[in-house]
Amino acid sequence: MSSSKAFVGARIFDGATWHDGEVLVIGNGEVATLSSGAPANAEVISAEGLLIAPGFIDLQVNGGGGVMFNNEPDVDGIARICAAHAKFGTTALMVTLITDRPDITAKAAEAGVAANKTGVPGFLC
């Protein structure tokens, strides 16, 4: 299987300009290029009629998906918050704690370190 993917047929927004008729090539999990055609070695994915745009980055998130970080200051809480926000286009976020007791603040800090070490998708530290 190829390590690069070519998304064809979509209308692509790069954050400043709309690109119609171009191919978005992803390599090693990152945007590699916009081109007029798919590379020969790429897995071609039809995105006909779809829009492709950058995800949102939210730098202050107190909760999501039924989880308030103050109530669940652990890695599972962070993962559930990140997953809930991802469904609506937020691809990266910073979980923030509302002012709380010192023991909750300590648990939240420990959870952030652990989430960073384990690579929770979407978590910024």
Predicted regions, residues:
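N-terminal metal-binding scaffold of metallo-dependent hydrolase/deaminase domains
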Residues: M1-P39
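Short coil/turn connectors at secondary-structure junctions
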Residues: S2-S3, A40-A42, E48, I52, ...
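A generic local secondary-structure boundary/capping motif
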Residues: D14, N116-G119
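Short, conserved beta-strand segments within well-ordered enzyme catalytic domains
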Residues: L24-V25, T33, D58, M68-N70, ...
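Divalent metal-dependent hydrolysis catalytic cores, especially in the metallo-beta-lactamase
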Residues: N62-G64, A79-A108, P121-C125
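N-terminal hydrophobic targeting/anchoring segments and the immediately downstream early-domain regions
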Residues: A111-A115
